[in-house]
């Protein structure tokens, strides 16, 4: 809107995300259509006379709703092309920017430096890995097994020598989705590139990392670590760390993501590319919890209770150099990201009640599990 675009929004206001209907922050200057992106009638109506599309509609959760992931995420992307190709005069779309996810990369990219290799887990996030060495080099491991997680063995290991692996920045060529959500997003990337080229519709897929900031719905089980930690702390409870809290994450502010979307739309050099959108800094989940405690003014301590979440990756830090070369960089540090989210959350009604309900549902459906080794809670 600030750049002079006429904006039309299509949203089905799913109750699990928007239980009170249309959010008050939707701009009055934007045309709002109530409808479903997976409905040919609704999407066709929304596309009439449209030049550019941001496809942000998605079903996100840790629950085992496998067919829903494919229907909402991948099928709606295929339907988008189908409707445009069927009538280019009524739907003269010139470019589409798709929201993808770093989850497409699966466990990501690691280095085996050999048994006994020393140094912090972030060692090769900050420096280039050696071209030669005693280990087995760069690896792209599969997901950790249920047996490994039940035993409380959180790190990834070399399949050849058993050495603990060092995480590397994840580039856009890395793909190994292992959850239904990630598989659906990978399908979107393939549809965008193949169908976009075939029918002459430029596309860009943005792989978001852990997007944080105000307006992040806390009504579904997926909403993320910021919501989960903040709601517990504001209700006088310590933040609970899954695994041991040493997972490395890459948090990016929603406003930085919005800027990346506009750049992808307006720069032809981005056409037919997959681009990582991350915060540019590796932060452990434990460190993030401490930032959240500080922002909430709490003296509580994080607790590691031996729980883990099925489908979680161990370390996820994006290589954002490709997007940087196009002129983008993250501007909002994680500390500010946390502070502004807490300020927004304090103003929301009945937030704590939904947190408890979401965690109960994940436990009942086997998404949150407990390791079989010593389960005694530890303060870290």
Regions flagged by a language model, labelled:
Residues 16-17, 105-108, 214-215, 284-285, ...:
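A short beta-to-alpha transition loop/helix N-cap that caps and shapes the active-site region
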Residues 138, 156, 165-177, 203, ...:
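A conserved pocket-lining segment of Rossmann-fold NAD(P)-dependent short-chain dehydrogenase/reductase
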Residues 65-68, 216-221:
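Short, solvent-exposed loop/turn segments at secondary-structure boundaries
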Residues 1-208, 379-380:
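N-terminal Rossmann-like NAD(P)+-binding domain of SDR-like oxidoreductases, especially those catalyzing
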Residues 58-62, 101-104, 210-216, 246, ...:
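Active-site proximal helix/loop that lines the substrate pocket
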Residues 77-78, 186-193, 226-230, 259, ...:
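Conserved active-site helix of classical SDR/Rossmann-fold NAD(P)-dependent CH-OH oxidoreductases
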Residues 2, 234-380:
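C-terminal substrate-binding subdomain of Rossmann-fold SDR/epimerase-dehydratase oxidoreductases
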């Amino acid at each position: 809107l600030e750049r002079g675009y006429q904006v039309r929004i299509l949203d089905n206001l799913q109750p699990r995300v928007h239980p009170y209907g249309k959010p008050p922050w939707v701009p009055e200057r934007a045309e709002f259509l109530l409808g479903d992106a997976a409905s040919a009638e609704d999407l066709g109506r929304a596309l009439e006379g449209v030049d550019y599309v941001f496809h942000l509609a998605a079903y996100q959760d840790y629950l085992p709703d496998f067919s829903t992931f494919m229907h909402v995420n991948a099928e709606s992307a295929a339907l988008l092309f189908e409707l445009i190709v069927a009538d280019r005069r009524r739907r003269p779309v010139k470019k589409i920017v798709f929201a993808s996810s770093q989850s497409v990369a699966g466990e990501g990219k690691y280095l085996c430096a050999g048994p006994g290799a020393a140094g912090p887990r972030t060692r090769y996030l900050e420096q280039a890995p050696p071209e030669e060495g005693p280990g087995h080099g760069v690896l792209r491991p599969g997901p950790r097994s249920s047996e490994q997680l039940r035993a409380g063995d959180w790190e990834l290991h070399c399949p050849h020598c058993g050495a603990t692996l060092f995480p590397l920045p994840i580039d856009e060529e890395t793909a190994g989705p292992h959850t239904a959500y990630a598989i659906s997003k990978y399908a979107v990337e393939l549809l965008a590139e193949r169908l976009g080229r075939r029918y002459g519709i430029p596309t860009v897929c943005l792989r978001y990392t852990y997007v944080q900031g105000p307006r992040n719905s806390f009504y579904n089980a997926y909403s993320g670590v910021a919501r989960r930690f903040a709601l517990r702390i504001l209700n006088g409870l310590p933040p609970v760390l899954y695994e041991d809290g040493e997972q490395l994450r890459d948090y990016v502010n929603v406003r930085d993501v919005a800027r990346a979307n506009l750049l992808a739309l307006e720069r032809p050099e981005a056409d037919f590319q997959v681009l990582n959108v991350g915060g540019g800094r590796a932060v452990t989940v434990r460190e993030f919890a401490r930032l959240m405690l500080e922002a909430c003014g709490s003296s509580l301590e994080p607790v590691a209770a031996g729980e883990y979440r099925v489908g979680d990756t161990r370390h996820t830090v994006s290589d954002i150099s490709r997007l940087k070369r196009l002129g983008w960089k993250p501007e909002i540090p994680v500390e500010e990201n946390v502070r502004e989210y807490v300020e927004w959350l304090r103003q929301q009604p009945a937030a704590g009640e939904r947190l408890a309900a979401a965690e109960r549902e994940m436990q009942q459906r086997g998404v949150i599990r407990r390791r079989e080794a010593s389960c005694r809670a530890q303060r870290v």
